[in-house]
From Swiss-Prot:
Annotated source species: Salmonella paratyphi B (strain ATCC BAA-1250 / SPB7)
Enzyme Commission number(s) from the entry: 3.1.11.6
CDD domains: ExoVII_LU_OBF
HAMAP family noted in UniProt: Exonuc_7_L
Role summary: Bidirectionally degrades single-stranded DNA into large acid-insoluble oligonucleotides, which are then degraded further into small acid-soluble oligonucleotides.
Name of a matching Pfam family: tRNA_anti_2
A GO CC annotation given for this chain: cytoplasm
UniProt name for this protein: Exodeoxyribonuclease 7 large subunit
GO biological process: DNA catabolic process
Subcellular location: Cytoplasm
Quaternary organization: Heterooligomer composed of large and small subunits.
Amino acid sequence: MLSSQTSSIFTVSRLNQTVRLLLEQEMGQVWISGEISNFTQPASGHWYFTLKDDTAQVRCAMFRNSNRRVTFRPQHGQQVLVRANITLYEPRGDYQIIAESMQPAGEGLLQQKYEQLKAKLQAEGLFDQQHKQPLPSPAHCVGVITSKTGAALHDILHVLKRRDPSLPVIIYPTAVQGDDAPGQIVRAIELANARGECDVLIIGRGGGSLEDLWSFNDERVARAIFANRIPVVSAVGHETDVTIADFVADLRAPTPSAAAEIVSRNQQELLRQIQSAQQRLGMAMDYYLANRSRRFTQIFHRLQQQHPQLRLARQQTALERLRQRMGFALEARIKQATQRQQRVSQRLSQQNPQPRIHRAQSRIQQLEYRLTENIRSRLSEQRERFGNAVTHLEAVSPLATLARGYTVSTTTNGKVLKKIKQVKAGDIMTTRLEDGWLESEVKSVTPGT
């Protein structure tokens, strides 16, 4: 008996591992609601706490990379909604959950319902792109399902009036918040389908909390939108608000104003497009007419060019050109011959000796004249220099000094007598006067004082 069961015997490690795998594979990720107790946060940054209700509790861990996304600080005794994976801590065999996200219990329950309905409808194919209806372009009538007193309706009408004032708008007023709102929204959708007045529907409201927007997360509303034959544009809340209606609708707009922009044409832009098209059409017509006109003119000219009179005129013109060319050629030949004759005559005249003799005689006459002028200039210059020298010599000549009453005496040996010591009594000296010489004997010598 024992031997037949040995193949089913688990070790403790294998048992814990098997149980962990079963928990993780079979349970997967779940939402758990409970009260926090024994909350701790060691230096690692992970959270460890116990989640309990009136009759049971379970150990929980939330690692740092997950708890950093939690927007509040968990408190002891706080009711929370936790999205977690079920697992087993193998070394101790402790069953525990690993939390991935955490929300306060009130809003968290709504989020849980939202996720569950989203998964359900997605599995049924309500979000598939193949079911989306294209929006009409352009829309001829717009239906609006929203509160008749809300800001969303005001924004939608304001945009439609600005962009396309002539576009008809039908309002299906409903509550957009509260217990009665989902039913009213469904009836408004069904009424719009039954009446068939509009070719596109805007369903939406202004922003708010998850609870405020909950009517658009209602399954009845989602299925009514899906079954609707009229294309639907959802416009719920702000751009960050995403509802089930957004997934089911044929197109999601981030805001009610944006939805109005999507379903309407901008008449000013349309007018600009028409004007631009008119301009392009006018330019195309002008180009076409100009092109045809050019083509007609070309054909007309070609026909004219084939006319016999025109061909005869062209031949006459060609003949006249030939006559002119022959005349020009003859004139050119005569001119060339004349020029050659002139060049020959010029060369012959250059070889005649008579012009060369005339040029040589003229050259000799020029040289004689220049030589005579040079001699005259040199003689005049020499006379002037000689006169200057005579004047200078006369100014320094001893004769000029004698003429003024002075005399010059010399000794018998011809030396000029300058001092008395050169002579003595009884010496003969010669004295030069202006008009002659005289000899005299020195009687006595008296030194000057």
